[in-house]
Amino acid sequence: MTYKIIGDSCLDLTEELKKDPGFQMIPLTLQVGNVQVIDDETFDQSAFIEMVKACPECPKTACPSPESFKKAYEEADADAVFVITLSNHLSGSYNSAVLAKELYEEEKKEAGEPVTKKIAVIDSLSASSGELDQALYIRDLCEQGLNFETVAEMAEAYSHRMKTYFVLETLDTLRKNGRLSGLQAFFATALNIKPVMGAEEGVIIKLDQARGINKALQRMCDIAVKETGDTPGTVSYTHLRAHETGAYL
């Protein structure tokens, strides 16, 4: 079985994987104030971060259109297409990708053509390195020679089994989107409180908090170890311009 793995641009591919024809990303659109930024190869992370800091409003995202997903399905030179998206609680990417699958199959049937390309859309229930873990898991299953249905079923189960944890170093976004009042954010910042967050079936939840980034990271690791125990698996981490934090982890 030949295969292609497609994700929205929150799929945190390494530079090496970006060159692999077996992977493809469909860009999200980011809105900061009145400025739209396409999350593709032209994306300037440093400039975007400064733009977000300077904007009093919370940044927004727009998911890829069904048409952009459908075009990727049509152009995929593979027997099977596996699509990985951001948690449906964070973005409309999943629904857009599912609609694109339905449109692709309907057009084939209306044209009297057989639907020979199999497509599975999988909600990662996560983001970033969580999507990457899912992509690498699917690749490994395909390389083992498993059939489409088995890979799709195992990938779906993997999403529900995977754990996601993160620490916020700044509370600006929570303040801007109204999840924290200005007063709460002020006192939390003054006391150097960092929230430890996680995802439960794709929904972001607060797990704990600590004073200082290192204590928060340690608490995050403690929670992860407690919840996963001796379960074998892969640990991946992503940071945003926080190399010292990455080294600490």
Residue positions per predicted region:
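Structural motif
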Residues: 4, 80-82
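Mixed-charge interfacial surface used for oligomerization/domain docking
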Residues: 4, 10-24, 29, 97-102, ...
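Short Gly/Thr/Asp-enriched flexible loops that form oxyanion-binding sites at enzyme active sites
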Residues: 86-109, 133-135
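N-terminal glycine-rich anion-binding loop in soluble enzyme alpha/beta folds
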Residues: 4-68
